[in-house]
A protein has these predicted regions:
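Basic, Lys/Arg-enriched alpha-helical interface segments
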Residues: 1-67, 76-80, 87-112
């Protein structure tokens, strides 16, 4: 049974602003997430630490010369809600994750 994946409305706006290469690479990873669901593990998916969201995950992929991370969480209906994404290449790892997690948490509160 395939899992469902959906964009938070703000993440959908972010997605259309990404380069075509990033959109294609992200879509390929999302198809894998739909097929496998929450058991998809490292190196493709890992749990983000330091979040108030239980089991906030990151989908990892490379595209357009960047090192991309997409934060998501499964809601009570078994839907993977895509919350926030960004390229962590050339950015302080601590600052990148602080920003990614804060954005994901803010959007998650408006989703529930």
């Amino acid at each position: 049974m395939p899992w469902h994946v959906t964009f938070h409305p703000e993440m959908a706006k972010d997605f259309v602003a990404f380069s075509r290469e990033v959109q294609i690479a992200m879509a390929a990873q999302l198809r894998l997430l739909e097929a496998v669901g929450p058991t998809l593990g490292r190196p493709t998916v890992d749990t983000l630490k330091g979040s108030r969201i239980a089991n906030l995950k990151e989908l990892r992929f490379a595209a357009d010369g960047g090192v991309w991370r997409l934060a998501f969480a499964f809601d009570g209906q078994r839907v993977a809600v895509l919350l926030a994404a960004g390229d962590k290449a050339g950015v302080s790892e601590a600052r990148f994750y602080r920003t990614l997690i804060a954005t994901a948490e803010k959007r998650w509160r408006t989703w529930e």
